[in-house]
C-alpha cells in the first residue's frame, strides 16, 4: 500500500520529503524546490503506540511526555484517517490497551476518546508490547511510537525485532529531561549526564533504521511531525 506510479500533481518541497520525489525540471524552470505527488494505490495500516507508563508523567502537569504524545497521536490519527488510511492504537502502562485498525470519522472519535482517557501508570516494557501485537500487524505496516525512551532496558531489543521484520518504525520522543530541567527539578550536571545517555540511545535506534525525532518542549508539534516524516 502507499503511492502508485501514476503522476498526480506537483507541490512545493516540505522538509522531510524524499529527494527521490524531487522534480528537477520544475526546479530548473522556477527556482523553487518542487516534488512529484502520485495517486495512492490503497490505504495503509498505521499503528500508533503510546507510552503511558508512570515515567511519561515526569514534568509539569500540562507539559510532560504523555500530554505531548497524546496530542501528537490525535493529530496523526486525524491526518491519516483523512487520507483514508486505517489507523489502530496501542497504549501501554500498567496494562496494554488496543484499538483495532479501522477507517473513517467513527474511528477518529474512538481514538480521540481513548487518548483523552490515557493515564500515566505502571511500567510495562516495550518488548512485552511488541511481542503481544506483532502477530496481529500486517508486515510492513508503519509503526509510530511516542515515548520518552526512559527506564526501559528492552527498547533496543524491541525496535531491533520490529526492524528485522521490515516494519517502518518512527519514534516521536518528548524529552522528559527537558521538562524536568525547564521546571528546575534537575541540575545542570545531572541533566548533562542523562542527556548524553539519551543521545547514545537515540543514535543506536537510528542505527537500527528507526526514524527518531528528539522532541524538545519548545518545539512546535508541526515541526516535530515534519522532522519525523517518512511514514
What are these regions (language model features)?
Residues 1-102, 142-146, 152-153, 158-161:
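An amphipathic, basic-hydrophobic helix/alpha-beta surface used to engage anionic
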Residues 16, 93-95, 121, 175-177, ...:
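Short, solvent-exposed coil/turn elements at secondary-structure transition points
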Residues 25, 119-123, 147:
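Short, flexible loop segments at the rims of nucleotide/cofactor-binding pockets, characterized by
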Residues 67, 120-127, 192-196:
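Conserved phosphate-coordination/catalytic loops
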Residues 103-141:
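Von Willebrand factor
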